[in-house]
């Protein structure tokens, strides 16, 4: 469980998983805004680039354990579910009170499965696909279409404002 002292954009570590065409500039925008970021991606060149900008590399389990807010930006819902629920995935170490935001393009069924699987652990989930492409990701002007419980949306809003 996260204490009140640990909550808030500039106080809580944020995990960012998926540093592709969209995710890499999104992660850099968060870093530029002063967010402490732990990152993971299969592409080690992308990880090295974002680490050079100030992030720290971490495994999925380390992100689950250390981060109060977690953003996922990967190509599919199947990948999101694997990142979350595989044996050494984010959910294996996640703390109650954490909020996970999947910004990938996923089906409603996949989103609901993630929501339900995390809710059982006392973890919030926001489904928040984006529009604006790479130029919007670089400029920090993405249109974000978020769905989830109000308190979880509120927990992610200050990050959405950066993205």
PLM regions with names:
Residues 53-55, 71, 75, 118, ...:
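Short low-complexity, flexible loop/linker segments enriched in glycine and/or proline
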Residues 42-43, 76, 149:
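Residues in the short beta-alpha loop(s) of Rossmann-like NAD(P)-binding domains
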Residues 60-125:
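Rossmann-fold NAD(P) dinucleotide-binding segment
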Residues 8-72, 134:
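NAD(P)+-binding Rossmann beta1-loop-alpha1 motif at the extreme N-terminus of oxidoreductases
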Residues 19, 105-163:
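Rossmann-fold dinucleotide-binding core
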């Amino acid at each position: 469980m996260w204490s009140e002292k640990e909550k808030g954009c500039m106080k809580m570590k944020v995990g960012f998983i998926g540093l592709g065409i969209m995710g890499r500039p999104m992660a850099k925008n968060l870093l530029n805004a002063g967010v402490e970021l732990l990152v993971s991606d299969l592409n080690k060149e992308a990880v090295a680039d974002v680490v050079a900008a100030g992030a720290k590399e971490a495994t999925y389990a380390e992100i689950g354990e250390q981060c109060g807010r977690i953003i996922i930006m990967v190509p599919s819902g199947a990948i999101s579910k694997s990142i979350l629920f595989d044996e050494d995935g984010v959910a294996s170490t996640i703390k109650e009170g954490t909020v996970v935001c999947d910004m990938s393009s996923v089906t409603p069924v996949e989103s609901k499965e993630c929501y339900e699987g995390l809710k059982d652990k006392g973890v919030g989930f926001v489904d928040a696909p984006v529009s604006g492409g790479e130029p919007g990701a670089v400029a920090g002007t993405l249109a974000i279409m978020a769905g989830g419980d109000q308190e979880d949306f509120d927990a992610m809003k200050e990050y959405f404002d950066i993205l």
